[in-house]
């Protein structure tokens, strides 16, 4: 059983609120979960402390048991200083493709 810490959407249409839950990865996003760890309200200002509420003791316990955080929850945990998130790196993104290189060289020659 692969256990993840992720966001489950709640709230109404156009006014989302997310519960931070521990769930089996096979369960639906908003479906069954094992335990609720907190909530996230994206409509609140970023500097408001009520925007994100997490029970850090429970989070640390689930991480110790092997639960994997989702990308968004990993950002929250990195900000809180609980778990360091490795930076994403794509060095080939800025390298032009072969065709573009050939076109640029041809244009430079003449």
Curated annotation (Swiss-Prot):
The keyword Ribosomal protein applies. Keywords: Ribonucleoprotein, Ribosomal protein. Residues 82-103 have a biased composition (Basic and acidic residues). GO terms for biological process: translation. Pfam families: Ribosomal_S16. Residues 82-110 are annotated as: Disordered. GO terms for cellular component: cytoplasm; small ribosomal subunit. The keyword Iron-sulfur does not apply. One of its GO terms (molecular function) is structural constituent of ribosome. Belongs to the bacterial ribosomal protein bS16 family. PANTHER family: 30S RIBOSOMAL PROTEIN S16 (PTHR12919), SMALL RIBOSOMAL SUBUNIT PROTEIN BS16M (PTHR12919:SF20). This is Small ribosomal subunit protein bS16. It comes from Bradyrhizobium sp. (strain ORS 278).
